[in-house]
Amino acid sequence: MENVYISSYSSNEQTSMAVAATDIRELLSQYVDDANLEDLIEWAMEKSSKYYIKNIGNTKSNIEETKFESKNNIGIEYSKDSRNKLSYRNKPSIATNLEYKTLCDMIKGTSGTEKEFLRYLLFGIKCIKKGVEYNIDKIKDVSYNDYFNVLDEKYNTPCPNCKSRNTTPMMIQTRAADEPPLVRHACRDCKQHFKPPKFRAFRNLNVTTQSIHENKEITEILPDNNPSPPESPEPASPIDDGLIRATFDRNDEPPEDDE
């Protein structure tokens, strides 16, 4: 393993030192067993270099801080830039305690990928202490194929071009809640996409016997033999009922009173 360069703060000046891999192992051996030591260091080195996040000042108005409870604070805090669709680390705060004081002090005095490496180590140590898997790649996802095996080629929609069942449904566009989404099927063999099949009525309702004959397509519209609803009477005129009175202009002569 390569040397890890750490910069630590003192009361007077900032000093920098190179900490070899053996020193990191000696530090981690205080918290974890030797059996988990190599895997933890390798995982932290890989993830810290892969998921390194930039540091910026929280001066923009469009940045929302993600709040963590103190019990869930593992030393990694993020803020979201809603305008640029990026994530940044902002104002890192580490709950220092006596158990991880040495490692927390090293995190406070570092920056860049070295800081990320130590933060991942702190996260992995806490997970090992609690008996939880820290590497998300080793966590097995729940398989729902027995319940929702929608990608089985046996039941897939066949491609109209090459008749292959190696197809995948895709939602192209989502619409309002009262409208169906735009769905297309893509064929992995011929690289063509096609519209999904539509449902058609395949049963014929016999009005006389009230029996359903399956697998017979409806070819004509059934007559509506139900009695028609009663005709509603015309509404009375509001003028006839005296609801609306005749109006006169102010220049007109007032109407004469009936004697």
Curated annotation (Swiss-Prot):
Its EC number is 2.7.7.6. GO terms for molecular function: DNA binding; DNA-directed RNA polymerase activity; zinc ion binding. Residues 226-236 have a biased composition (Pro residues). Induction: Expressed in the early phase of the viral replicative cycle. It holds the Pfam family rpo30_N. Zn(2+) binds at C159, C162, C187, C190. SMART domains: ZnF_C2C2. Part of the DNA-dependent RNA polymerase which catalyzes the transcription of viral DNA into RNA using the four ribonucleoside triphosphates as substrates. Responsible for the transcription of early, intermediate and late genes. DNA-dependent RNA polymerase associates with the early transcription factor (ETF), itself composed of OPG118 and OPG134, thereby allowing the early genes transcription. Late transcription, and probably also intermediate transcription, require newly synthesized RNA polymerase. This is DNA-directed RNA polymerase 30 kDa polypeptide. It comes from Vaccinia virus (strain Copenhagen). The gene is OPG066.
